Structure formats: structure tokens, C-alpha cells
Amino acid sequence: MDILHRIGIQNATPEKVYDAITTLDGLSDWWTEKTEGETGLGGVIAFRFIPGGFDMKVTELDPGRLVRWEVVDGPPEWIGTTIRWDLEQRGDYTIVLFKHEGWREPVEFMHHCSTKWATYLMSLKQLVETGEGAPSPRDVAISDWH
């Protein structure tokens, strides 16, 4: 089972969006301020939230087109899943097709994560379009789980 989202980022090149997804500064400006690690191929990036977090291994990079990570540590539901970002220029927009692939079953946590991914993707869009995102802990609280 997969979580799927699509956003369009206006007046931004795929390379600019790619940089926001593949650099520590970019990631900490839209996803979580507590981001560290190695963002190159084979590197592991640690993302920390209140509470908890997860580690992602960078498994594929195609500049301006594709980013793929494998979850190597974190909540049991996430371990072994993959995060994929496909980027494509369409007119004045960079289209981002986002996939969190490989969920074993549609547990309540998957529902929560799907909504949180949507809020973080809007933060990515906001960052690239305006220069300011809404990363954790300044993100939108969607429920009692945050």
C-alpha cells in the first residue's frame, strides 16, 4: 500500500525543488528543523520530531528528476518502506509526484502519516515559492498525535 500526493510548485525549476529535497538546509526549512546526516547517494539522513523520528538511506538520485530514500530506522510501520519524489517541469510549474511506498497494511498510523505528508508537501511548496516553509515543530498540528 502506498501514500500518494501531487503538488505543483509555481515559478520554480525542478533543480530548485530538488535542492530543497536533497540538502540539509532545504530539508530543515520545510520538513523538520532537526535534520542531520549525509544527503549523498548511500548516505543516511536522520529526521527528528517530537516525539521520535526516523532514518532514511539515500538510494537513488537523479538531479532535477528523482529522489528515493529507504527507511532504515524508525517506527516499525515505516521500516523497509521507501519515499520517492518524481519531479517534472510543466509550464510555469514543477510537478512533484510523491510516493511513500510499501506500507504492509492500512493501519491508523498510515492515515495520520498521509495527512502529515500533505501538510509537509505544502510546506515544501511554500518554501520554494516564498522562501519560508513551516517545518516541525512549527508545522500544522492535525490531531492529538500532532
Label each PLM-derived region with a short phrase.
Residues 126-146:
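Short, highly charged C-terminal tails/helix-capping segments
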Residues 1-36, 146:
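Hydrophobic ligand-binding cavity/cleft-lining segments
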Residues 2-6, 44, 53, 66, ...:
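Intrinsic-disorder/low-complexity, polar/charged segments enriched in Ser/Thr/Lys/Arg/Asp/Glu/Gln
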Residues 6-8, 56-60, 81-88:
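Hydrophobic/aromatic beta-strand elements that line small-molecule binding cavities or substrate pockets
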Residues 17-18, 27, 45, 58, ...:
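Hydrophobic pocket/interface hotspot
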Residues 28-74:
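Glycine-rich portal/gate segments that line the openings of hydrophobic small-molecule binding cavities
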Residues 75-126, 135-137:
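Beta-strand/loop substructures that line and gate deep hydrophobic ligand-binding cavities in soluble
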Residues 14-15, 59-65, 86-95:
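A short, structured loop/turn motif at beta-sheet edges
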